[in-house]
Amino acid sequence: MSLILPLEKPALNLRPLLWLLLPLLVLATLFFWPLSLIVEQALRGANGEIGLETFRQVVDSKRFVGALLNTLQIAFFATAGCLLLGSVMSLILVFIPFPGSELIGRVVDTFIALPTFLITLAFTFIYGSAGLLNGALMSLFAFELPPVDFLYSMQGVILAEITVFTPLVMRPLMAALRQIDKSQLEAASILGAHPLRVIGQVIFPAALPALMAGGSLCLLLTTNEFGIVLFIGAKGVNTLPMMVYSKAILESDYTVACMIALINIVLSLGLFSLYRLAASRTGVRSQPC
Protein backbone atom coordinates (compact mmCIF):
# COMPACT_ATOMS: atom_id res chain seq x y z
CA MET A 1 0.00 0.00 0.00
CA SER A 2 1.51 3.32 -1.09
CA LEU A 3 1.35 6.40 1.05
CA ILE A 4 0.37 9.74 -0.49
CA LEU A 5 2.47 12.43 1.10
CA PRO A 6 1.08 15.98 1.15
CA LEU A 7 2.97 18.42 -1.04
CA GLU A 8 4.92 21.00 0.85
CA LYS A 9 3.80 24.55 0.18
CA PRO A 10 6.59 26.73 -1.19
CA ALA A 11 7.86 29.23 1.30
CA LEU A 12 6.69 32.77 0.69
CA ASN A 13 9.58 34.82 -0.67
CA LEU A 14 9.36 38.33 0.72
CA ARG A 15 12.66 39.52 -0.72
CA PRO A 16 11.13 41.02 -3.92
CA LEU A 17 8.64 42.92 -1.78
CA LEU A 18 11.44 44.28 0.37
CA TRP A 19 13.35 45.44 -2.71
CA LEU A 20 10.18 47.16 -3.93
CA LEU A 21 9.52 48.79 -0.58
CA LEU A 22 12.66 50.93 -0.62
CA PRO A 23 12.00 52.78 -3.91
CA LEU A 24 8.35 53.21 -2.94
CA LEU A 25 9.44 54.75 0.34
CA VAL A 26 11.81 57.11 -1.46
CA LEU A 27 9.07 58.12 -3.92
CA ALA A 28 6.58 58.65 -1.13
CA THR A 29 9.04 60.82 0.81
CA LEU A 30 10.45 62.90 -2.03
CA PHE A 31 7.47 63.12 -4.41
CA PHE A 32 4.06 61.98 -3.23
CA TRP A 33 4.17 63.58 0.22
CA PRO A 34 5.26 67.06 -1.02
CA LEU A 35 2.72 66.79 -3.85
CA SER A 36 -0.04 65.93 -1.39
CA LEU A 37 0.90 68.99 0.70
CA ILE A 38 0.65 71.19 -2.41
CA VAL A 39 -2.75 69.72 -3.29
CA GLU A 40 -4.04 70.19 0.26
CA GLN A 41 -2.81 73.80 0.42
CA ALA A 42 -4.30 74.56 -3.00
CA LEU A 43 -7.74 73.16 -2.13
CA ARG A 44 -7.96 74.71 1.34
CA GLY A 45 -9.95 77.93 1.18
CA ALA A 46 -9.75 81.04 3.32
CA ASN A 47 -12.20 79.52 5.83
CA GLY A 48 -10.03 76.40 6.20
CA GLU A 49 -12.43 74.09 4.36
CA ILE A 50 -11.50 71.95 1.37
CA GLY A 51 -13.09 73.21 -1.85
CA LEU A 52 -12.61 74.82 -5.25
CA GLU A 53 -12.85 78.42 -4.08
CA THR A 54 -9.19 79.14 -4.84
CA PHE A 55 -9.44 77.42 -8.23
CA ARG A 56 -12.35 79.64 -9.29
CA GLN A 57 -10.50 82.70 -8.02
CA VAL A 58 -7.41 81.82 -10.06
CA VAL A 59 -9.26 80.88 -13.26
CA ASP A 60 -11.28 84.12 -13.20
CA SER A 61 -8.08 86.18 -12.97
CA LYS A 62 -7.01 87.91 -16.21
CA ARG A 63 -3.42 87.72 -15.01
CA PHE A 64 -3.61 83.92 -14.83
CA VAL A 65 -5.25 83.62 -18.25
CA GLY A 66 -2.51 85.80 -19.74
CA ALA A 67 0.21 83.76 -18.05
CA LEU A 68 -1.36 80.51 -19.29
CA LEU A 69 -1.54 81.77 -22.88
CA ASN A 70 2.05 83.05 -22.69
CA THR A 71 3.24 79.70 -21.34
CA LEU A 72 1.55 77.74 -24.13
CA GLN A 73 2.68 80.17 -26.82
CA ILE A 74 6.31 80.11 -25.70
CA ALA A 75 6.28 76.32 -25.29
CA PHE A 76 4.82 75.56 -28.73
CA PHE A 77 6.92 78.07 -30.68
CA ALA A 78 10.12 77.13 -28.84
CA THR A 79 9.45 73.41 -29.41
CA ALA A 80 8.73 74.00 -33.10
CA GLY A 81 11.96 75.98 -33.39
CA CYS A 82 13.91 73.23 -31.62
CA LEU A 83 12.50 70.59 -33.96
CA LEU A 84 13.22 72.64 -37.09
CA LEU A 85 16.73 73.75 -36.11
CA GLY A 86 17.62 70.38 -34.60
CA SER A 87 16.47 68.51 -37.71
CA VAL A 88 18.46 70.72 -40.10
CA MET A 89 21.62 70.62 -38.00
CA SER A 90 21.36 66.85 -37.45
CA LEU A 91 20.95 66.18 -41.18
CA ILE A 92 23.98 68.34 -41.97
CA LEU A 93 26.21 66.84 -39.28
CA VAL A 94 25.30 63.22 -40.13
CA PHE A 95 24.93 63.20 -43.92
CA ILE A 96 27.13 66.14 -44.99
CA PRO A 97 30.33 65.67 -42.99
CA PHE A 98 32.85 68.51 -43.16
CA PRO A 99 36.05 69.36 -41.27
CA GLY A 100 35.07 70.17 -37.71
CA SER A 101 31.67 68.46 -37.78
CA GLU A 102 32.66 66.08 -34.98
CA LEU A 103 33.81 69.02 -32.86
CA ILE A 104 30.49 70.78 -33.42
CA GLY A 105 28.65 67.61 -32.38
CA ARG A 106 30.62 67.48 -29.14
CA VAL A 107 29.98 71.18 -28.48
CA VAL A 108 26.25 70.53 -28.94
CA ASP A 109 26.47 67.75 -26.34
CA THR A 110 28.14 70.09 -23.85
CA PHE A 111 25.24 72.54 -24.18
CA ILE A 112 23.06 70.08 -22.29
CA ALA A 113 25.37 70.25 -19.27
CA LEU A 114 25.38 74.06 -19.14
CA PRO A 115 22.94 75.88 -16.82
CA THR A 116 20.22 77.80 -18.63
CA PHE A 117 21.15 81.13 -17.07
CA LEU A 118 24.64 80.89 -18.61
CA ILE A 119 23.20 80.80 -22.13
CA THR A 120 20.88 83.66 -21.22
CA LEU A 121 23.83 85.65 -19.88
CA ALA A 122 25.65 85.12 -23.17
CA PHE A 123 22.57 86.39 -25.01
CA THR A 124 22.60 89.50 -22.83
CA PHE A 125 26.25 90.18 -23.67
CA ILE A 126 25.54 89.78 -27.40
CA TYR A 127 21.99 91.09 -27.98
CA GLY A 128 21.38 93.22 -24.88
CA SER A 129 20.95 96.99 -24.87
CA ALA A 130 24.65 97.39 -24.06
CA GLY A 131 25.69 94.20 -25.85
CA LEU A 132 28.24 93.66 -28.58
CA LEU A 133 25.77 93.81 -31.47
CA ASN A 134 24.09 97.04 -30.37
CA GLY A 135 27.45 98.59 -29.52
CA ALA A 136 28.82 97.81 -32.98
CA LEU A 137 25.69 99.08 -34.78
CA MET A 138 25.57 102.29 -32.74
CA SER A 139 29.25 102.95 -33.46
CA LEU A 140 28.94 102.28 -37.19
CA PHE A 141 25.64 104.05 -37.92
CA ALA A 142 25.51 106.59 -35.05
CA PHE A 143 22.20 105.35 -33.65
CA GLU A 144 21.04 107.22 -30.55
CA LEU A 145 19.17 104.20 -29.17
CA PRO A 146 20.03 100.49 -29.38
CA PRO A 147 18.45 99.26 -32.66
CA VAL A 148 18.20 95.62 -31.53
CA ASP A 149 15.76 95.28 -28.62
CA PHE A 150 14.04 91.93 -29.17
CA LEU A 151 15.85 90.23 -26.27
CA TYR A 152 13.57 91.68 -23.59
CA SER A 153 10.39 90.43 -25.27
CA MET A 154 8.65 87.11 -25.84
CA GLN A 155 10.70 86.64 -29.01
CA GLY A 156 13.89 86.87 -26.96
CA VAL A 157 12.61 84.24 -24.52
CA ILE A 158 11.67 81.90 -27.39
CA LEU A 159 15.06 82.36 -29.10
CA ALA A 160 16.91 81.67 -25.85
CA GLU A 161 14.87 78.52 -25.18
CA ILE A 162 15.47 77.30 -28.74
CA THR A 163 19.21 77.73 -28.21
CA VAL A 164 19.14 75.92 -24.87
CA PHE A 165 16.86 72.98 -25.73
CA THR A 166 17.73 72.22 -29.38
CA PRO A 167 20.49 69.77 -28.30
CA LEU A 168 17.78 67.67 -26.62
CA VAL A 169 16.31 67.09 -30.08
CA MET A 170 19.65 66.60 -31.79
CA ARG A 171 21.03 63.89 -29.51
CA PRO A 172 18.38 61.20 -30.13
CA LEU A 173 17.87 62.35 -33.72
CA MET A 174 21.54 62.06 -34.68
CA ALA A 175 21.68 58.61 -33.10
CA ALA A 176 18.64 57.54 -35.15
CA LEU A 177 20.03 59.02 -38.37
CA ARG A 178 23.31 57.13 -37.98
CA GLN A 179 21.37 53.85 -37.83
CA ILE A 180 19.69 54.38 -41.22
CA ASP A 181 20.92 51.96 -43.87
CA LYS A 182 22.97 54.05 -46.30
CA SER A 183 22.14 51.61 -49.11
CA GLN A 184 18.51 52.80 -49.01
CA LEU A 185 19.64 56.38 -49.53
CA GLU A 186 21.96 55.37 -52.35
CA ALA A 187 19.22 53.35 -54.04
CA ALA A 188 16.81 56.29 -53.84
CA SER A 189 19.44 58.61 -55.33
CA ILE A 190 20.22 56.18 -58.16
CA LEU A 191 16.52 55.98 -59.00
CA GLY A 192 16.50 59.76 -59.37
CA ALA A 193 14.64 60.71 -56.20
CA HIS A 194 14.92 64.37 -55.21
CA PRO A 195 16.78 64.97 -51.91
CA LEU A 196 13.62 66.39 -50.33
CA ARG A 197 11.72 63.26 -51.36
CA VAL A 198 14.46 61.09 -49.85
CA ILE A 199 14.18 63.03 -46.60
CA GLY A 200 10.38 62.77 -46.57
CA GLN A 201 9.99 59.11 -47.56
CA VAL A 202 13.16 57.44 -46.26
CA ILE A 203 14.78 59.52 -43.53
CA PHE A 204 11.74 61.06 -41.83
CA PRO A 205 9.85 57.79 -41.11
CA ALA A 206 12.99 56.29 -39.56
CA ALA A 207 13.68 59.42 -37.51
CA LEU A 208 10.08 60.00 -36.36
CA PRO A 209 10.42 58.19 -32.99
CA ALA A 210 13.53 60.22 -32.12
CA LEU A 211 11.84 63.46 -33.23
CA MET A 212 8.78 62.79 -31.09
CA ALA A 213 10.89 61.82 -28.09
CA GLY A 214 13.05 64.94 -28.30
CA GLY A 215 10.09 67.18 -29.13
CA SER A 216 8.03 65.95 -26.19
CA LEU A 217 10.92 66.55 -23.81
CA CYS A 218 11.39 70.08 -25.20
CA LEU A 219 7.67 70.76 -24.85
CA LEU A 220 7.64 69.72 -21.20
CA LEU A 221 10.80 71.66 -20.34
CA THR A 222 9.71 74.85 -22.12
CA THR A 223 6.32 74.67 -20.42
CA ASN A 224 7.99 74.63 -17.00
CA GLU A 225 10.99 76.87 -17.79
CA PHE A 226 11.60 79.50 -15.12
CA GLY A 227 15.24 80.60 -15.18
CA ILE A 228 15.33 81.96 -18.73
CA VAL A 229 12.19 84.09 -18.31
CA LEU A 230 13.39 85.40 -14.94
CA PHE A 231 16.94 86.16 -16.07
CA ILE A 232 15.93 87.93 -19.29
CA GLY A 233 13.30 89.97 -17.48
CA ALA A 234 11.09 90.24 -20.55
CA LYS A 235 8.58 93.07 -20.26
CA GLY A 236 5.00 91.91 -19.95
CA VAL A 237 5.93 88.23 -20.36
CA ASN A 238 4.41 86.40 -17.42
CA THR A 239 4.31 82.60 -17.38
CA LEU A 240 2.85 80.08 -14.94
CA PRO A 241 6.21 79.31 -13.24
CA MET A 242 6.88 83.06 -12.94
CA MET A 243 3.41 83.56 -11.45
CA VAL A 244 4.03 80.80 -8.89
CA TYR A 245 7.28 82.54 -7.90
CA SER A 246 5.71 85.99 -7.61
CA LYS A 247 2.71 84.72 -5.62
CA ALA A 248 4.80 82.65 -3.20
CA ILE A 249 7.94 84.79 -2.76
CA LEU A 250 6.83 88.35 -3.47
CA GLU A 251 3.20 88.28 -2.30
CA SER A 252 3.36 85.40 0.25
CA ASP A 253 0.07 84.05 -1.12
CA TYR A 254 0.93 80.37 -0.79
CA THR A 255 -2.59 79.06 -1.41
CA VAL A 256 -2.85 80.71 -4.82
CA ALA A 257 0.75 79.76 -5.60
CA CYS A 258 0.01 76.11 -4.85
CA MET A 259 -3.12 76.19 -6.99
CA ILE A 260 -1.22 77.66 -9.96
CA ALA A 261 1.54 75.09 -9.44
CA LEU A 262 -1.08 72.32 -9.40
CA ILE A 263 -2.59 73.63 -12.65
CA ASN A 264 0.90 73.73 -14.14
CA ILE A 265 1.43 70.09 -13.16
CA VAL A 266 -1.89 69.08 -14.74
CA LEU A 267 -0.95 71.02 -17.88
CA SER A 268 2.39 69.22 -18.13
CA LEU A 269 0.75 65.82 -17.64
CA GLY A 270 -1.87 66.71 -20.25
CA LEU A 271 0.78 67.66 -22.81
CA PHE A 272 2.66 64.44 -22.10
CA SER A 273 -0.57 62.45 -22.50
CA LEU A 274 -1.13 64.09 -25.89
CA TYR A 275 2.37 63.02 -26.90
CA ARG A 276 1.67 59.44 -25.81
CA LEU A 277 -1.61 59.47 -27.73
CA ALA A 278 0.07 60.80 -30.87
CA ALA A 279 2.84 58.23 -30.50
CA SER A 280 0.34 55.38 -30.22
CA ARG A 281 -1.63 56.65 -33.24
CA THR A 282 1.52 56.81 -35.38
CA GLY A 283 2.92 53.51 -34.09
CA VAL A 284 5.93 55.20 -32.50
CA ARG A 285 7.55 53.55 -29.53
CA SER A 286 8.91 55.71 -26.75
CA GLN A 287 12.65 56.17 -26.81
CA PRO A 288 14.89 57.48 -24.09
CA CYS A 289 16.14 60.96 -24.71
Swiss-Prot record:
Domain ABC transmembrane type-1 intervals: 68-275
Instruction: Look up the record and report any one GO term of the cellular component aspect.
Output: plasma membrane
Its membrane topology is listed as: Multi-pass membrane protein
Q: Which InterPro entries match?
A: AminoethylPonate_ABC_perm-PhnU (IPR017636), MetI-like (IPR000515), MetI-like_sf (IPR035906)
Where is it localised? Cell inner membrane
Chief subcellular location equals membrane
GO biological process terms, alphabetically, are: 2-aminoethylphosphonate transport; transmembrane transport
* The entry's keywords: Cell inner membrane, Cell membrane, Membrane, Transmembrane, Transmembrane helix, Transport
Q: Which Pfam families match?
A: BPD_transp_1
The residues that cross the membrane are 19-39, 76-96, 111-131, 150-170, 202-222, 254-274
Q: Does the keyword Plastid apply?
A: no
Function per UniProt: Probably part of the PhnSTUV complex (TC 3.A.1.11.5) involved in 2-aminoethylphosphonate import. Probably responsible for the translocation of the substrate across the membrane.
Q: Which PANTHER family match?
A: INNER MEMBRANE ABC TRANSPORTER PERMEASE PROTEIN YDCV
Question: In which family does this protein belong, per the annotation?
Answer: Belongs to the binding-protein-dependent transport system permease family.
This protein's name: Putative 2-aminoethylphosphonate transport system permease protein PhnU
In its UniProt entry, the species of origin is given as Salmonella paratyphi A (strain ATCC 9150 / SARB42)
UniProt lineage:
Bacteria, Pseudomonadati, Pseudomonadota, Gammaproteobacteria, Enterobacterales
